[in-house]
Amino acid sequence: MARISLHDFSPADVNRGPWIPTSLSNNPRAGQWSSERMSQGMVADYKRFLMTDGEGIRCSLYVSGCPFHCVECYNESIWDFRAGYPYTQKLEDQIMEDLALPYVQGLTLLGGEPLLNTGILLPLCKRIRSEFGNTKDIWSWTGYTWEELMRKGETPDKLELLRYIDILVDGRYMKNLHDSLLQFRGSSNQRIIDVPKSLENPSEPPVIWEKLHDQERFIPSIYGKDRASGEGDAS
């Protein structure tokens, strides 16, 4: 597969992570980055039965490779598309076996950048829908914003994968917008998007997941009640 070159990056220089030359950026033009050119078919990790990567008990697949390179990304060790190990039929069969368990709600796609690994993920998601229908949900994180994915000229495989995804957490991680009270996100620019509802009107702003409940909405009032009752006083 072709190696990434300077031409794979736009000339702007916004929110670069470490080790990114000043001529490179994490703001790609429409269609500039593609799975066909960049993915090496590698995965970094597969984790079973987690409750941190979306709603309910989930299995999580971490694909390798991400050119967004966000500042203080917690997964910078797998920015390289060659990191990790090859995705195999054996791993796919294990994922399907785990998803068949009645207490597992669904699969989460992370990375790395899932939408630049569609060669792996499209067949997997198609198999999930074929064998489980909509009884198992699919979540995904992406560095792309919804608006970037909907713009004219973006590679069609990204939209094809989106059609199998139920919930998308979109946008780069922005260090200056970090908020530890956000649900399933690291920075306040990111959104939890209901993909099927949003695709009904792709030219409109995306529909936010109806179960969103950021902790910052509730903690101040709870803290105030605790203070009024004397809980937490040093005395």
Model-predicted regions and their roles:
Residues S64-P67, V71-Y74:
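Cys/His/Pro-rich metal-binding microdomains
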Residues D166:
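Receiver (REC) domain switch/active-site residues of two-component response regulators
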Residues S39-A44, I57, E72-L161:
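Conserved Radical SAM active-site core
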Residues G119-R129, H178-R227:
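P-loop/Walker A phosphate-binding loop and immediately adjacent motor/lid segment at beta-alpha junctions
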Residues A2-Y62, N75-F81, D214-R217:
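N-terminal [4Fe-4S]-dependent radical SAM core
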Residues T142-G143, G171-Y173:
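Short secondary-structure boundary segments
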Residues P114, Y173-M174:
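Short glycine-rich anion-binding loops that position phosphate/pyrophosphate groups of nucleotides
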